[in-house]
């Protein structure tokens, strides 16, 4: 669309007086546009579905990928605590509005359409339990020639309050348009997760593609002990059973 789109979830109120707020409102997804990250458009409500009642109260945690001319987004329904997938050729098209209580009504006369609901639900999460609910998803394209044969990956946080391991549970698909996602936690053992000082593992993040040279710069700046000396191609000759000298 020629601009960056920045989006987030907000609870909206009629005025700025916090003392006048007698109860929480529901989460709505909101976006602004910018081309310089200095000046931003006025906020626009993007997803407006009142899911109050039951377990939650709105829509949060959108992640988006563009495939050809189509945008795919996955986000959390706070009522069912589940992940849903939609598609559109118009990224900033809004759905829902005042009084809209369900996604079927929200999508009527909208540029967005439903692709999948309850993504991953009921599958073994690969960490000894079942994927029941998730949040903070991160949708990203597989590298060209990915050895696993997948087209896109989806990392979703399954917190302990969703009977999960408190970190990402990976999923994958061979066709993002199908909405068919397979949980592949067995391919990403916990031992391979980075861990911070309090034992926490990755969740609610974003995966960004980088070139090998960019990755080298990141290592040099933040992990010099494991940074390689060069990313240039090289060749070496050796015999069977003897490690090459590089």
Predicted regions and their residues:
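Carbohydrate-active catalytic/glycan-binding domains of CAZyme proteins
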Residues: 1-227
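Short, solvent-exposed loop/linker segments at the N-terminal edge
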Residues: 232-245
């Amino acid at each position: 669309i020629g601009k960056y789109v920045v989006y987030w979830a907000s609870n909206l109120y009629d005025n700025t007086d916090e003392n006048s707020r007698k109860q929480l409102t529901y989460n709505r997804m909101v976006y602004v546009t910018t081309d310089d990250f200095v000046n931003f458009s006025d906020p626009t409500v993007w997803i407006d579905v009142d899911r109050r009642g039951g377990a939650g109260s709105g829509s949060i945690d959108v992640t988006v990928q563009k495939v050809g001319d189509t945008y795919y987004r996955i986000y959390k329904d706070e009522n069912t605590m589940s992940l849903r997938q939609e598609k559109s050729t118009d990224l900033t098209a809004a759905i829902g509005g005042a009084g809209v209580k369900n996604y079927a009504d929200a999508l009527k006369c909208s540029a967005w359409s439903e692709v999948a609901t309850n993504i991953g639900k009921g599958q073994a999460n690969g960490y000894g339990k079942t994927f029941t609910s998730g949040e903070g998803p991160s949708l990203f394209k597989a590298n060209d020639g990915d050895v696993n044969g997948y087209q896109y990956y989806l990392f979703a946080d399954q917190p302990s309050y969703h009977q999960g391991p408190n970190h990402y549970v990976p999923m994958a698909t061979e066709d993002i348009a199908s909405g068919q996602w397979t949980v592949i936690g067995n391919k990403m053992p916990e031992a391979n997760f980075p861990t911070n000082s309090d034992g926490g593992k990755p969740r609610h993040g974003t995966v960004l593609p980088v070139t090998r040279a960019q990755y080298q710069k990141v290592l040099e700046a933040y992990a010099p002990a494991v940074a390689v000396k060069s990313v240039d191609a090289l060749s070496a000759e050796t015999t069977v059973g003897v490690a090459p000298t590089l």
